A protein has these predicted regions:
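Gram-positive cell-envelope targeting signals
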Residues: 1-62, 146, 170-185, 210-214, ...
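Basic, amphipathic N-terminal segments that precede the first structured/catalytic domain
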Residues: 34, 41-81, 86-90, 96
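Conserved SGNH/GDSL esterase-like catalytic core that processes O-acyl groups on lipids
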Residues: 72-167
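Structured segments of extracytoplasmic/periplasmic soluble domains
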Residues: 84-88, 92, 137-140, 172-179, ...
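Active-site segments of SGNH/GDSL-like serine hydrolases
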Residues: 149-153, 175-208
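Charged helix-capping and loop-helix junction motifs
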Residues: 162-172, 204-210
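Catalytic His-Asp segment of secreted/periplasmic serine-dependent ester chemistry enzymes
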Residues: 192-251
Length: 251
């Protein structure tokens, strides 16, 4: 039976269209320098001063531009972290039949929100029964880069105030950065909703507001932002493209 097309498949493919990173070192020692993605901010891990104006992505370089496909090696060198949308990266395959991600390079937890990054013990390793938080697991995995996506489970009601969401998300990102400061951290956009969704309390107005807040957060703290939502969104309607979500209209 042919599976319905899920946005996770296209999103995972789009993740390869980031700036090309360097290959991971053969040892556990940290790389001598940052990759091209964050070289301009790697010299200091302290946040830059907050700006009062909306950042211009083309000038500050926060939003990653489209590039040529970086290939399979880019995906394999990347640790994907997130909620059920990330879980689905292991369920969908590319044209060769290879899953976009595996248990070796993904930490995905169904229904997880940004506030649980530092508290939820959600990862364990082969041969051990000990559970680890995301930052703890990252320190053990020592990835070349991270693409992280939380936010779908932080949506609720009709408020467009992303203050609490950004605060907890930033705390999680900083904890990851402290645990393993030798990798690039790329924050992926909250994916768009289907107009025909089960939970009508969730709106694209809120998604857009939260994503705009993510761009500002990334700019102020030296992270990169991957606008993955643009490949999933119908420019004419503002909602997710037809047939790019499951029956609930959210995933």
């Amino acid at each position: 039976m042919k599976l319905p097309f899920c946005r996770a498949a296209l999103l995972a493919a789009a993740l390869g269209v980031c700036l090309v990173g360097c290959k991971p070192a053969a040892t556990d020692e940290p790389a001598a320098s940052a990759t091209a993605e964050t070289a301009e901010v790697a010299a200091t891990l302290t946040p830059t001063a907050a700006t009062t104006a909306q950042p211009v992505a083309a000038e500050i370089g926060t939003v990653l531009p489209a590039t040529e496909d970086a290939g399979r090696s880019y995906l394999d060198e990347t640790l994907f972290i997130g909620d059920s949308n990330t879980v689905r990266y292991t369920m969908y395959a590319d044209e060769t039949g290879t899953a976009f991600a595996s248990v070796d390079n993904s930490i995905g937890v169904v229904s997880m929100g940004a506030g649980a990054i530092t508290t939820l013990k959600c990862e364990k390793f082969k041969g051990s029964s000990t559970m680890y938080t995301v930052p703890e697991a990252v320190a053990m995995l020592k990835p070349q880069r991270i693409i992280i996506c939380y936010g779908t489970n932080n949506l609720g009601g009709s408020s467009t105030d992303a203050t609490s969401y950004i605060k907890t998300y930033l705390q999680g990102l900083q904890a990851i950065q402290t645990a393993w400061p030798y990798c690039d951290i790329i924050v992926s956009a909250i994916p768009p909703l289907d107009k025909q969704r089960e939970n009508t309390n969730l709106t694209m107005t809120q998604v857009d507001a939260y994503n705009a807040a993510l761009v500002t957060m990334c700019e102020e703290n030296g992270f990169k932002f991957l606008n993955s939502a643009e490949v999933l969104r119908d420019a004419a309607t503002g909602w997710a493209k037809t047939d790019y979500t499951l029956s609930d209209g959210v995933h």
